[in-house]
């Protein structure tokens, strides 16, 4: 669908200006033709426009049901694009490490699919929108699958329970090491976030027991919740998150390391699930307005995938009522519309 072999000169470096007036460089190309190079200056300009347009937006509020998240500076705001040939364009607070939260669900799903195959995971977890809040116990009772999909909490806990290991620590290390390979660098647990969530995760424990009632959890319920809580507490910055997204855009190959981290056969299933359920109750409106697979987290991050081209990640803590970053949604919508990234638009095919 996408032709990645445009014959254009390899442009090596560019700069964009941040509020401190210090230049941030666009990473050097790897020598291949770039899906962003033909319009590199345009992309950088659009990022600048989006940053300026939405930086003072005061809508939304930080998640407050997790004490740590309520204390994060609500003014933090960073934008990063990573292309499938590892060009990096950034603006704002892109080096701040925030908790990945529900975006982790994407990559635990990928890990489970790599181990068991997409069809087996679909059989055990399902992939249907619930039409209810992401932490709803009612969906566990009402949905025929009882798990809904991998991106609501019940389905995510069940997905985490599929990860093999000799004990809890082994399973957790498998997940964290996999996330690091997708990010192209070592990721770590934000211990304060983990402790804050572990002290308030009674609802997720209740979900795990409901799953056990319906035989839809595949390891010890409370141990699975603990691992799930840890995966949500992993720290990422906007650049790392964009690279994790670009790995999906690049058919499972990390554009920084060249490693095939995720099996190519899993990518369409992951992206389709992101499209239908990636932004909680806002997923339908997102598909209507933006037309990109994406996943949000209550830590304030959203990553959106442009298959064959790259990914855009935005971090801004204030959330809407559905639990999605207000600024991140607006930025990605703006960039996608300006650059014709909408997958359902004919203009998104190739560069014109």
Task: Give, region by region, the residue ranges found by the protein language model.
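Bacterial N-terminal signal peptides that target proteins for export
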Residues: 1-11
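Bacterial N-terminal signal peptides
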Residues: 10-23
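Boundary at the C-terminal end of the N-terminal hydrophobic targeting segment
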Residues: 26-28
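Structured C-terminal helix/loop/strand segments within mature extracytoplasmic catalytic/sensor domains
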Residues: 31-36, 47, 250-352
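Active-site-adjacent helix/loop patches that line small-molecule binding or acyl-intermediate pockets
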Residues: 33-53, 57-59, 112-231, 247
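A short, well-structured edge-of-sheet supersecondary motif
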Residues: 55-91, 301-304
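Short Gly/Pro-enriched turn/cap motifs at secondary-structure boundaries
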Residues: 69-72, 147-149, 199, 291-295, ...
């Amino acid at each position: 669908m996408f032709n990645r072999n445009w014959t254009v000169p390899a442009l090596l470096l560019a700069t964009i200006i941040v509020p401190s007036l210090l230049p941030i460089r666009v990473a050097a190309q790897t020598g291949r033709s770039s899906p962003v190079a033909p319009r590199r200056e345009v992309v950088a300009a659009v990022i600048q426009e989006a940053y300026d347009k939405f930086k003072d937006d005061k809508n939304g509020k930080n998640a407050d049901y997790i004490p740590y998240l309520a204390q994060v500076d609500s003014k933090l705001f960073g934008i990063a694009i990573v292309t499938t040939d590892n060009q990096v364009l950034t603006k704002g607070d892109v080096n701040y490490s925030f908790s990945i939260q529900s975006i982790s669900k994407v990559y635990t799903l990928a890990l489970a699919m790599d181990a068991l195959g997409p069809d087996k995971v679909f059989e055990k977890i399902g992939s249907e929108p619930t039409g209810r809040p992401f932490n709803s116990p009612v969906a566990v009772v009402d949905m025929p699958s009882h798990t809904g999909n991998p991106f609501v909490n019940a389905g995510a806990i069940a997905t985490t329970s599929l990860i093999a290991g000799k004990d809890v620590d082994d399973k957790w290390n498998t997940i964290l090491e996999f996330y690091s390979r997708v990010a192209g660098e070592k990721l770590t647990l934000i211990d304060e976030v983990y402790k804050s969530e572990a002290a308030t995760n009674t609802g997720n424990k209740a979900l795990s027991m409901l799953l056990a009632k319906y035989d839809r959890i595949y390891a010890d319920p409370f141990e699975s919740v603990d691992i799930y809580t840890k995966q949500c507490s992993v720290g990422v910055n906007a650049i790392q998150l964009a690279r994790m997204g670009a790995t999906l855009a690049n058919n499972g190959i990390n554009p920084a390391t060249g490693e095939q981290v995720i099996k190519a056969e899993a990518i369409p299933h992951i992206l389709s699930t992101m499209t239908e359920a990636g932004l909680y109750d806002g997923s339908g409106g997102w598909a209507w307005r933006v037309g990109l697979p994406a996943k949000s987290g209550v830590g304030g991050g959203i990553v959106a995938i442009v298959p064959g081209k790259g990914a855009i990640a935005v971090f801004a803590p204030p959330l809407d009522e559905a639990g999605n970053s207000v600024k991140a949604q607006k930025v990605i919508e703006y960039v996608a519309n300006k650059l014709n990234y909408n997958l359902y638009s004919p203009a998104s095919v190739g560069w014109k």
